């Protein structure tokens, strides 16, 4: 793609999720990059926080690079951007003065990053979860990703919920915590039964996701951890199956739980996997470059 003109061009990609947000600005010709990180940016969980995080990261990149908004094509991929009302509201706040702007779901940016824009079935396992396919004719489709309250099976947050449910059942059966998983959980939240119940009622998706690693760490030595993780694996395999459907597509796992989850998958599922060529941030930048190319083509 040739973008040479008298006005330097930049692309800006934003990847925002339930735990962290990363933004990258890149000069089209020199390929120089600037990258910054911040907190959560999920429209599902907290609109105001998502807006504040994105605004802050964008301003940081403008300061670091000296670029102006009118020189930039930006694609912002956020968890929860499927909510049309919230998306329109946020786009109205963020899009002003940019050369061109697109707000989409983090599932879309993950999908295009997973296999560098080539056909693929992408499964994102982070604080939340979602599946998506990109076929040879360019058609894309999403599966799952309904958010923590009614979906997100296979995610870090839902694995955390499985841990809590298991330990609460243990308390009911024994009137005390006996498993290694339960004891590790109490150590992590710095309290016993009462604190556990209080924590459970107040916890956000990111909090539930923060305890998910315990199931992996204790899998080999704790039956309760093994039971919980086995259910998580079933949920992930179901999401993979639903996402692929009738498409014979390679599968890419992305997100913070992708690598920890892989060793426990069924061998038949493992044969479907290929290594990712990129991530959601790469996908956002890929889409931003496409957006800039389209804008330039329309204006020539």
Please provide the spans of the model-predicted regions.
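N-terminal short leaders/motifs
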Residues: 45, 79-86, 229
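ATP-binding/phosphotransfer module of carbohydrate and carboxylate kinases, centering on a glycine-rich
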Residues: 1-72, 93, 113-121, 164-300
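Phosphate-binding/catalytic loop of phosphoryl-transfer enzymes
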Residues: 81-177
């Amino acid at each position: 793609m040739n973008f040479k003109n008298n006005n330097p061009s930049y692309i800006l990609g934003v990847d925002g999720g339930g735990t962290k947000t990363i933004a990258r600005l890149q000069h089209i010709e020199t390929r120089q990059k600037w990258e910054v990180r911040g907190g959560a940016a999920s429209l599902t969980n907290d609109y105001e926080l998502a807006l504040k995080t994105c605004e802050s990261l964008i301003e940081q990149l403008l300061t670091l690079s000296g670029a102006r908004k009118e020189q930039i094509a930006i694609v912002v991929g956020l968890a929860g951007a499927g909510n049309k009302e919230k998306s329109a509201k946020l786009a109205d706040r963020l899009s002003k003065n940019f050369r061109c702007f697109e707000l989409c779901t983090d599932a879309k940016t993950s999908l295009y990053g997973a296999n560098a824009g080539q056909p693929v079935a992408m499964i994102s396992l982070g604080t939340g979860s979602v599946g998506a396919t990109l076929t040879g004719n360019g058609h894309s489709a999403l599966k799952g990703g309904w958010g923590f309250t009614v979906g997100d099976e296979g995610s870090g947050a839902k694995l955390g919920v499985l841990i809590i449910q298991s330990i609460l059942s243990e308390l009911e059966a024994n009137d005390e915590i006996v498993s290694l998983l339960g004891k590790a959980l109490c150590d992590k939240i710095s309290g016993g039964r009462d604190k556990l119940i209080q924590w459970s009622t107040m916890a956000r998706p990111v909090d539930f996701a923060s305890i998910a690693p315990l199931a992996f760490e204790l899998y080999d030595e704790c039956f309760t951890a093994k039971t919980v993780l086995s259910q998580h694996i079933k949920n992930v395999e179901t999401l993979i199956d639903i996402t692929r459907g009738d498409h014979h597509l390679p599968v890419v796992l992305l997100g913070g739980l992708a690598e920890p989850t892989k060793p426990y998958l069924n061998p038949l599922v493992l044969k479907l996997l290929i290594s990712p060529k990129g991530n959601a941030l790469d996908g956002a930048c890929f889409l931003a470059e496409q957006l800039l190319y389209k804008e330039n083509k329309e204006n020539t």
